């Protein structure tokens, strides 16, 4: 469980630290910092919605739903009994990222984003957006943790594949 809590707390700490830097050096100055021209920049944004900035739910409902999901992830990780490093790592990243964004939602009602890859612009669900959104460390941790669950499913949950069930979903 140390690995779970180490990653959870590390993600929260790194997320909070980098968001504060983004506020100071990007929001307060109104500047965007180009790292790789035409590809990657540090660009300040505040996101009231969920993935890709979509606002499907009222902020209060989104806050409650996010709290329930993050709590469920933590409870599942604590009581599941699986102590494999990949299990603890993936759920630690997901929980840490969820808490990092939840802190923003509780304190300001929106999530601070600042990492931007300019990969493609177009329409998604009828709304024009940069199809690669501006995101943050918490989002990255959630995505990496979820990808770990998919890629290493058989190693994280060996009992489910040993019984002949190859279905992930």
From Swiss-Prot:
Its main location: membrane. It is a multi-pass membrane protein. GO terms for biological process: proteolysis. The chain crosses the membrane at residues 56-76, 84-104, 132-152. It comes from the Bacteria. GO terms for molecular function: aspartic-type endopeptidase activity. Its EC number is 3.4.23.36. It is found in: Cell inner membrane. Disulfide bonds: none annotated. InterPro entries: Peptidase_A8. Keywords: Aspartyl protease, Cell inner membrane, Cell membrane, Hydrolase, Membrane, Protease, Transmembrane, Transmembrane helix. NCBIfam families: lspA, PRK14787.1. This protein specifically catalyzes the removal of signal peptides from prolipoproteins. This is Lipoprotein signal peptidase. It comes from Chlorobium phaeovibrioides (strain DSM 265 / 1930) (Prosthecochloris vibrioformis (strain DSM 265)). The lineage of its organism: Bacteria, Pseudomonadati, Chlorobiota, Chlorobiia, Chlorobiales.
